[in-house]
Amino acid sequence: MLQFSKYQGLGNDFLILEGRRAALPGDVVEPDPAWVRQLCDRRFGIGGDGVILALPPEQQGDLRMRIFNADGTEAEMCGNGIRCLARFLADSDGDSAGRRWSIETPAGLIRPELQQDGQLLVDMGAPFLEPSSIPTTLPLVDGLARGTVELADTSLDVAAVGMGNPHVVIPVEDLSSIPFERWGAALEVHPAFPAKTNVHFLQVHARDRLEIRVWERGAGPTLACGTGACATLVAAVLLGLADDQAEVMLPGGPLQIAWPGCSGSVLMTGPAVAVFDGVLSPDLLPAPLDPMSFAAPAAVETAQGNISFECARDCVDACQQPDNCLRDAAQQQVQAFLNSTSLDAMLNLASESLEQRTRSRFDRDIR
């Protein structure tokens, strides 16, 4: 069986799969985008804005993170996602305030730290301001990639900032008066952003109080975006609209963002909360199923003799071993477990690790 944990940061929710100690199946580590879309579907799957894999490190980090958007595409980084992963690590490993992790991501090494109040302070690294690093075709003007973008029905003055992933920030007078979804969808795929982009509409309430609405690349409207809040502050500072520290309000709640001295790393502080643990049903397992995830043999004895055989490699179009199918055997094992286990027992099994983590956290808070 494949267990998962669901966490959310300001309503931006993720399914986390633990693979630091026990190897995840190959079909999970390199997931089919269709499987990710199925998991994230809020009607026919579990529901989420993305899937996070916690994996062994490849370099000098404590672990490695891969994150996939709800549309199945892989993202370089996600601020809310990395806070959720850090909260998961703290809950799973019994860590206390002051614990700091070095997490490898495609955007570089990111370092979240657990605070005394349970929030996560994340060193997000320095912003990317050169157009080629974002990437964008917008010109660099006074240290910021910016210009006018033409849409079908309007022209918008925009600024682009990279936080390991691309962002475009559009200052507006009133967030409630813009055609958010139409402009957001158009800007995400605009030719000025060759890798597509996350889109943030910004209303400035005060130099230390900003408000944004988020159109996330690969996910659409979302309640929050941590890297987007960081990119927004950087753009607002360079446009002369904000100080180097501000509260950034999102539909899901506020984040505290700082860019000390307008140079070096951007710092993000915000919450992350456990929602529930679960076990994927056979219908939600990736297909073709990697037999190693169920400790089935990697090779099967066939009528022709000893032939190495792998479902994931050889059964792409149809089962090649109908009389001795590893996938069927694995599904039968799962089905036998489901048939022989009461609903209460399954619920207890699915919630046990979350209960243990929650109890440990409460014990630490009391101490």
Regions found by a protein language model. Give the residues of each.
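Flexible, glycine/proline-enriched loop segments at strand-loop-helix junctions
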Residues: 75, 125, 132-136, 171
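Transmembrane helix-loop-helix hairpins in multi-pass inner-membrane proteins
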Residues: 117-122, 127
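Active-site-proximal beta-strand elements of phosphoester/diester hydrolases
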Residues: 123, 157-162, 268-269
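A glycine-rich beta-to-alpha transition motif near the start of alpha/beta enzyme domains, typified by
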Residues: 1-117, 168-292
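Active-site glycine-rich loop that binds ribose-phosphate moieties when present
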Residues: 128-156
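Internal active-site segments that recognize and position negatively charged phosphoryl groups
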Residues: 145-177
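Cysteine-centered metal-binding/redox modules
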Residues: 292-367
